[in-house]
Amino acid sequence: RELVSNAVDATQKRKALIRVSEIEGNADGAQVHVILDSEAKTLTIRDAGIGMSEEEVDKYINQIAFSGATEFVEKFQEKYADQSEAKEAIIGHFGLGFYSAFMVADRVDILSWSQRAGQAPVKWTCDGSPNYEMGPMSEDDFKALGRDEAQLHGTDIVLHIGEEGAEFLEDQRIMGI
């Protein structure tokens, strides 16, 4: 839910920037899609919002979100003996939506195209540990997403669903969120 909410926020920001002529574009094209690929075991949240630069990914994902999420998740896992109860308690908690993705995913990729001119598309990858990889998005990464080339702004968050999150590969479970 939090990931979809973040995607909606990004599209709303893009619409607002278009309305005040800060950027060019069509505000009607700012959409969010949830793409389930059971065969590849991925769940992608795709938005046509403002996107993020490498600097913004570092700030919002690596610094702000990660620092608060680690301590919070540890406290919740100590409190709940049952792992599934811990997951339910954490998911949806304000500010932890992004890192709650690791409770169902073995790996998360962020691929983002900033709306700001001169910013290279960025790819961030993490397996839930404190270690991550971040750098320019390759042409192969872009092609693999199957994104429309006219839509060179926004963010794809790709969850590579693990065994514990298998229920999130079912249409009904996704529709319930």
Question: Which functions belong to the PLM regions below?
Answer:
Residues 1-163, 168:
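GHKL (Bergerat-fold) ATPase N-terminal catalytic module, capturing the glycine-rich phosphate-binding loop
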Residues 173:
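Short, flexible catalytic-loop segment of classical short-chain dehydrogenase/reductase
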